[in-house]
Each structure stands twice: as structure tokens, then as C-alpha cells.
Amino acid sequence: MDLGVIGLGVIGKAVVRAADEGELPFTVSAAATRTPGNVRDFLNSLKNAPRLTDLAGVVASSDVILEASGGHTVEAICRAALPLGKSVIVNSVGALLEREDLIALAEKHKARIMIPSGAIIGLDGLKGAAAGGIASGTMTTRKPPPSLKGAPFVEENNIDVDAMTEATVIFEGSPLEACKGFPANVNVSAAVSFAGIGPHRTEMRIMCDPTINRNIHEVEAVGEFGRLFFRIENVPTENHRTGILTYLSNIQFLRQQTATLVVGT
């Protein structure tokens, strides 16, 4: 099968390289990026580099499309691919919140919208718990100041993250609000809400913590199954916002698409 990759940042590059090295059950013949000049050295390092084209070109030449380009591109990718019966793997999960129209479009054309676990763990447990009923769900994200710089919520509220000397709560609300205020930082909260009790009932807290150098996510859920709690400390990549686990999760997710033995809910 041919995988089209839109976005050649940390995630896109990792997936393309894995395919080039024969680690995936996909070939990548086409990719798109807003900054082709920034990926020339990367493409030259590959044995079989994908052809750079635009969104339409990627969709036309691929069986499945992987979005790694930011929430602002998700709708356009879905509307181009889903009517052709082509499934879309979405990393910018926040862009799918309250987009029942895109889910309906996929259903109409017998395509799928797929969400890798990304930088979070425990989604299998949440999905299982949700089948029986979850009474409450909370998520707390701690990030070092560089990871939060430039976020719309930080800019609009004139929050000086560099001035903080201790862990400080800078946001409390729902995943829906969090993804609008921190579109490049907390896509994990959208994934957690999809797996659990939804974006309106899930409680979200974001903390700026100058004492850490990792992105830390903690999730707690309570229901008839009992109580679950999980925590992950992600090592950031060079762009500070994306954890290494995010691209590793994408690679494993793609492997699972043709795996004989599949583990997890």
C-alpha cells in the first residue's frame, strides 16, 4: 500500500525514513510540505525519496494519508481524501473535536479517520473503561517554558513563561478549550477525550514548570470498573512541542495495520 505524508516535520520525517528503511508495510511515493527548502538534505539522505507535491497530489497518488502538518490542514485533507474512500491518519487530533461532519463524511464513503496514541499512553484502558461507563476524567499536562512559548492562550493572556520560577497552573478548562488555546501542545487531551468521556466532560489542566525538561501527562478516570491513573514523561524532540514517543507511536500504529498479532483494545 502507498502512504501519503502531509507535513515533513518531526513526525513526517520519522515515518518517511522508517518506510524508506523497510520498517513499514507501506511505501511513501508522495509527500507535501510548506517548506520544501528545509527538507532537501533530508530527502537527499533517503534511498527512495518521495516526490514532493501538494495536498491534492498526495491524495491522488496514495491509498492512505497521514496528516502531520497541523490542525489547520485537517479539514482540507479529510475533504479531499474521504470522498474517495481513502482513510486519513490524524495527528492534530484537536482539529477533530466537534467535527461530526467529518466523521459522517468518512462513514458515508466507507473510509476511516484514525488517531494514533501519539504522546499519550493508556488509551486502550480508557476505551475499555468507557464501554462500561466513566464517571469522571481529568488530565494534567506539565510542560517546560520553551514548549509553551507562542501558544495562542499564552500570547493572548500575556503570560510570561520565562518569568516563572515554580510549577504554575496557567490553564484550567476542557480539552476543547485547551486545543484552541494550545493547538500545538495538547493534542493528547483530544485523544484522551475521544477514548474516554468526551471533550466537554473531561477536565483539563495545563502547568508551566521550569523545573522539568520533559513533557509530563497524567490522566485519572473513575467509573464502575474502578480507578485508573497513568503518567508519562516524554523526552521532547528538537522542536520542544513534540515528544519522541509521538513519532514512535505513528511508526508502530502503521505496522499494526497489517500485523497478524495485534495487542491492545
Task: Identify the role of each PLM range.
Residues 48-61:
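Short acidic low-complexity segments
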Residues 65-67:
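N-terminal Rossmann-like NAD(P) cofactor-binding module of classical short-chain dehydrogenase/reductase
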Residues 79, 84, 92-112:
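Rossmann-fold NAD(P)-binding glycine/threonine-rich loop
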Residues 6, 119-265:
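Active-site-lining helix/loop region of Rossmann-like oxidoreductase modules
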Residues 22-43:
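NAD(P)-binding Rossmann-fold cofactor-contacting core
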Residues 12-13:
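N-terminal Rossmann-fold NAD(P) dinucleotide-binding loop
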Residues 1-4:
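Extreme N-terminal starter segment of soluble prokaryotic enzymes
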Residues 101-120, 135-139:
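Rossmann-fold dehydrogenase core element
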